[in-house]
Amino acid sequence: MVVDLPRYLPLLLLLELWEPMYLLCSQPKGLSRAHWFEIQHIQTSRQPCNTAMRGVNNYTQHCKQINTFLHESFQNVAATCSLHNITCKNGRKNCHESAEPVKMTDCSHTGGAYPNCRYSSDKQYKFFIVACEHPKKEDPPYQLVPVHLDKIV
C-alpha cells in the first residue's frame, strides 16, 4: 500500500500540533481546577523561574512554554472573583479583573527538555483577569474560586 503523503500532510501537521495544545490545556488528574490554578499561578514570594516552574512541570512531565506567577495569596486572588463579571477571551462571562495591579513574574521557556527546563523571567506590576467557578468539595470554602488566568492587563 502506498500512502499519498501530500494528501495527508495537513492532518499529520494538525496531529503534531494537537499534543502540545492538549498538554497546555489539561490539568493533572486528582486536582481540582482551583488547586491546579494555585499550583500554576500563585507564588506569594518570588522564586527564580527555573525553580518555580519545576513545581508546575513535575505535574505535566513537560516544559510549559509560558507561565505567569501572581505574587499574591490565593485568598487575595479569590477575592477578585467577587468583583463584577466581565467577558473572558473565550466569550464566557465568568471573568473578573483585579481591583489593583499586583506584582507578578512571567516565565518563558528558553531551552532544555523536561526535567531540565530553563526559563527567563520578566517581573511586572499589572492587573490580572481570572475566570472563576463555584468551588468543588475539596476547594477552599469561597463563594467562587479562580480556575484560569485569562489575561494580564
UniProtKB/Swiss-Prot annotation:
Active site per the UniProt annotation: H41 (proton acceptor), H148 (proton donor)
GO biological process: antibacterial humoral response; antimicrobial humoral immune response mediated by antimicrobial peptide; defense response to Gram-negative bacterium; defense response to Gram-positive bacterium; innate immune response
Main location per the UniProt record: secreted
Intrachain S-S bonds: C49-C107, C63-C117, C81-C132, C88-C95
GO CC annotation: extracellular space; lysosome
Family under the similarity heading: Belongs to the pancreatic ribonuclease family.
Tissue specificity: Highly expressed in spleen (at protein level). Has little or no expression in healthy kidneys (at protein level). Detected at high levels in infected kidneys (at protein level). Expressed at low levels in bladder. Also detected in skeletal muscle, heart and bone marrow.
UniProt source species: Mus musculus
SMART domains in alphabetical order: RNAse_Pc (SM00092)
Residues annotated as site: Facilitates cleavage of polynucleotide substrates: H62
Name of protein: Ribonuclease K6
Glycan attachment residues as annotated in the record: N58, N85
EC number(s) reported in the record: 3.1.27.-
CDD domains registered for this protein in UniProt: RNase_A_canonical (cd06265)
The organism's taxonomic lineage, starting at the top: Eukaryota, Metazoa, Chordata, Craniata, Vertebrata
Binding-site list for substrate: K64, Q65, I66, N67, T68, K89
Enzyme class: hydrolase
Compartment(s) of residence: Secreted; Lysosome; Cytoplasmic granule
Gene3D superfamilies: Ribonuclease A-like domain
Site entry: Critical for catalytic activity: K64
Binding partners and assembly: Interacts (via N-terminus) with bacterial lipopolysaccharide (LPS).
MF GO annotations: endonuclease activity; nucleic acid binding
Role this protein plays: Ribonuclease which shows a preference for the pyrimidines uridine and cytosine. Has potent antibacterial activity against a range of Gram-positive and Gram-negative bacteria, including P.aeruginosa, A.baumanii, M.luteus, S.aureus, E.faecalis, E.faecium, S.saprophyticus and E.coli. Causes loss of bacterial membrane integrity, and also promotes agglutination of Gram-negative bacteria. Probably contributes to urinary tract sterility. Bactericidal activity is independent of RNase activity.
